[in-house]
Amino acid sequence: MHCVKKVTDDLYWIGGSDRRLALFENVYPIPRGVSYNSYVLLDEKTVLLDTVDASISGLFFENLEYVLNGRTLDYLIVNHMEPDHCAVIGDVVRRYPDVKLVCNAKTVPMLKQFFNFPVEDRTVIVKEMDTLCTGKHTFAFVMAPMVHWPEAMVSYDTVDKILFSADGFGTFGAINGNLFADEVNFERDWLDDARRYFINIVGKYGVQVQNLLKKAATLEIKMICPLHGPVWRENLGWFIEKYDTWSSYKPEDQAVMIAYASIYGNTENAAEILASKLADKGVKNIAMYDVSVTDPSVIVSESFRCSHLVFAAPTYNGGIFIKMDEVLRDIEAHSLKNRTVAFMENGTWAVTCGKQMKEIFAGLKGMNLIEDTVTIKSALADGQEAQVEKLAEAIAETM
């Protein structure tokens, strides 16, 4: 049976949620599931804004047929061609053979790659700030290349002032009845997933997100309808500010994240002692993660949130411990900038991982690397407490 939500008098949400999927993009854990949002506008012309993942295709078509209530579908606006949003375009075309696909020129090759139906004779190609009148409503189209695919664009309803933001302003997490962000405690229950979604999916493309935010700032926006997560109709500025912070690589919090790898517990012990000394110096916002049991997406996200980062690891086969190396390479791939970073290294012989960890961060922009690396030979010796104290002081003094 259909399950739809009314967004405005003539706009409906016809998406759904997947709580069975373990890994988003087969990479990122989503214990709270994920929603795939799609919207239908009932104007003089009917408009579908994006489709959904194949996993909820049955519900999607029930919802679409229910909302159309016997009307044909005139337009399908394709804001983003990633398969979790475009998977059923071919089925839409088969069910509604007269539908026109509204997209930009970069979308056309992707349509041909994913689907076998003739594309050119059913597409309406739009460019920056082109418009489409559907009766009462007029859509304007804003290109958003590499947020986070090259063909991405957003659509703006100039009448109701609604931004259909594609993957922008999305979040992990299934919709549990409440569609609107103001109906839930977003900061408590959704913000961590919103941050982890943005940082891991889009975080590499901060410059491109900043460009889109500048374009959006010229529009009067009363509502944001993303392709994942809740719809925003209140307090939009708060969430937009989060995106501005994340995409400009500014720390969200004055906080210390300590990520450690430990084979037999000795490096963990050193990390615990450092955290205790930081707390003694008045540092209140400290987060600790064991990289062997914490998914890298969490640590990458926390690296964007926190102003100060500490990485503690043993040397392993002459290099950085495998799980730590994975995390650091992921942080590097997301082009993190503007952090204060400290290191602790361990090894029973040939301790080299501290130098190698530093080299990774030396290649990133705006990094303040604290020179006083703590070097441990197997286990932290009693005489080394002063070294940990000195490192704690160096971190605390820069906060």
What are these regions (language model features)?
Residues H148-A152, G168-G203, S247-E252:
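Active-site-proximal loop/helix segment associated with metal-binding centers of metalloenzymes
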Residues V88, T294-I299:
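Short acidic active-site motifs
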Residues V4-E65, V154-D157, K161-S165, T267:
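Conserved beta-strand hairpin/beta-sheet module of binuclear metal-dependent hydrolase folds
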Residues L49-T51, L73-M81, L101-N104, L163-D167, ...:
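Active-site neighborhood of phospho(di)ester-bond hydrolases with catalytic His/Asp-centered motifs
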Residues I175, F186-I224, H228-V231, I273-Y289, ...:
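FMN-binding flavodoxin-like domain, especially the glycine-rich phosphate-binding loop
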Residues E44, S55-V102:
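Active-site metal-binding motif and surrounding structural segment of the metallo-beta-lactamase
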